[in-house]
């Protein structure tokens, strides 16, 4: 095992992969790192999808603006979150709402509450939930001599359809 700072220094975005399969015990440890990460308000409203199926990886590559490297990865780990929570439905004393009112200001939250596309608001509100576990997953992968790349451009609605 590497020291933490060595793992951090070695982490890189990689878009070309060996075809070697990732052993299940390694994959399970990488996923455990994501599960052990903190979540805002201990919401734990994130989950991970492990994709090995070639057809599904190809569909995800298309949903990501035809980034073909995605389809060549031996495994794609999808970082997912529930978007059931709508800030419009939260009580005024909800801790997350109070924190974000302090962070962004009441005018911003009022604007978000009036925004007609509630699905877009929910996506924005819950967007960060899988990011911390995602970084834990990346660092655990590096510790096993693996790497990958964040997918920044992604049609999340289409990806959700593919993964379901």
Model segments located where?
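Acidic, surface-exposed loops and disordered segments
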Residues: 1-164
């Amino acid at each position: 095992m590497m020291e933490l700072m060595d793992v951090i220094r070695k982490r890189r975005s990689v878009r070309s992969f060996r075809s070697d399969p990732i052993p299940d015990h390694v994959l399970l440890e990488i996923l455990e790192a994501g599960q052990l990460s903190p979540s805002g308000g201990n919401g734990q409203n994130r989950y991970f999808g492990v994709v090995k199926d070639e057809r599904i990886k190809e569909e995800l590559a298309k949903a990501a603006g035809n980034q073909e490297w995605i389809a060549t990865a031996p495994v794609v780990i999808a970082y997912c979150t529930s978007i059931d929570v709508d800030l419009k439905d939260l009580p005024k004393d909800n801790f997350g709402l109070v924190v974000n009112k302090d962070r962004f200001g009441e005018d911003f939250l009022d604007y978000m509450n009036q925004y007609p596309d509630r699905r877009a608001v929910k996506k924005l509100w819950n967007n960060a939930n899988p990011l911390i576990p995602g970084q834990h997953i990346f660092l655990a992968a590096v510790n096993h001599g693996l790497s990958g790349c964040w997918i920044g451009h992604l049609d999340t609605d289409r990806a959700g359809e593919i993964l379901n």
